[in-house]
Regions:
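N-terminal acidic leader/helix
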Residues: 1-19
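N-terminal intrinsically disordered, cationic/polar leader segments
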Residues: 2-8, 27-30, 34-64
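General helical structural elements
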Residues: 15, 26-27
Length: 64
């Protein structure tokens, strides 16, 4: 595996995840704002090629 090529591919994937996730969250908040003023999120990273990969991030965003 060539390290530089892998690094570029990984950065591209992470950029796509970040940009598309932000768009979806902003759309949700505009169209259906949570009544509690807090949006709880969970993001899971899995891979069909690596069944042991199960990385979960949970975060709450205050909308006030």
């Amino acid at each position: 595996m060539e390290e530089d090529r892998f690094n570029l591919a990984l950065r591209g994937f992470l950029k796509e995840v970040g940009v598309t996730s932000q768009r979806e969250i902003e759309k949700l908040v505009r169209e259906h704002p949570p009544q509690a003023g807090i949006l709880r999120l969970r993001m899971a990273l899995t891979s069909p090629d690596a069944p042991t990969l199960n990385h979960v991030i949970e975060h709450a965003i205050s909308l006030a």
